Amino acid sequence: MKYFYFVIFIFNFMFSQSWYNHPELEWQTIETEHFLIHYHEETTRSGQETAAVAEKIYEPITSFYEFEPDSKTHIIIQDTDDISNGAAYYYDNKILISALPLDYDLRGSHRWLNNVITHEFTHIV
């Protein structure tokens, strides 16, 4: 019985990681002075806007808190789920943003991406 649980554990670990990283997507990276923006084809516009917003908010946030990250912060933009959310991982210097397309009909005129990038980067700093 222990062997059975061990095999289940190993298979679960192996397959959960490949699902999470979405190896079926072709990831691209935009490098700016302070950030590495990772995105896939469906989030190209979001990736480009993220790069502009992130650089715009970098100086005000880092000067306010008098702290700058030691290395470039990674921002990952994905559209693999039907949610809009963000998360900051301080120890990894990484921000994950689950974003619906910018031209989504129900989005309205609210600049959600600007707010979430500012909010999550503040957690990093």
Task: Go through each PLM region and give its residues.
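Sec-dependent N-terminal signal peptides
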Residues: 3-14
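Juxtacatalytic substrate-recognition/specificity segment
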Residues: 17-125
